[in-house]
């Protein structure tokens, strides 16, 4: 294990096109390197880069499920944006994975599998290996606006113990949580994070609020 190494963490990546950004798409075309052109140098030089994939990948004409205010679907070719950008792992544990129901989620997983891009699902404990052979445990969970958290605290602690047993040298807990536009963590977030750290997690990777937090 190196004396020190760098992990990079990207926030919510919504790759789906929007009418207000159509001019950019018309100009950029299929230049998948464009979105991360100014940051790829950092991600290429680090040990491992994580991102939250806040959209579905599908080429099917699917209808939104439920009544989301926003729903995001990107063509499957847009997975190349992540690959060209130096992303090594994405979490899909968020409130937009199921914007287009089970079929949208299935297409998303298939797209990531075909691209060879590792990903995490809700409640999935796994150990990934970085380019220099470091074993990092990753566990993903989420809630919406500080509501019911999936998985539970006990399940998070059990997952940490399992990842240790599976050889993880460092453990990252990737949580899509909290309230949008709130700068400070809620007490629920603090309590869960502390329980995870006490159990042996090394880092809490939080996404969702759309603002920087402590």
Name each model-derived stretch.
Residues 1-214:
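Acidic, metal/ion-coordinating pockets
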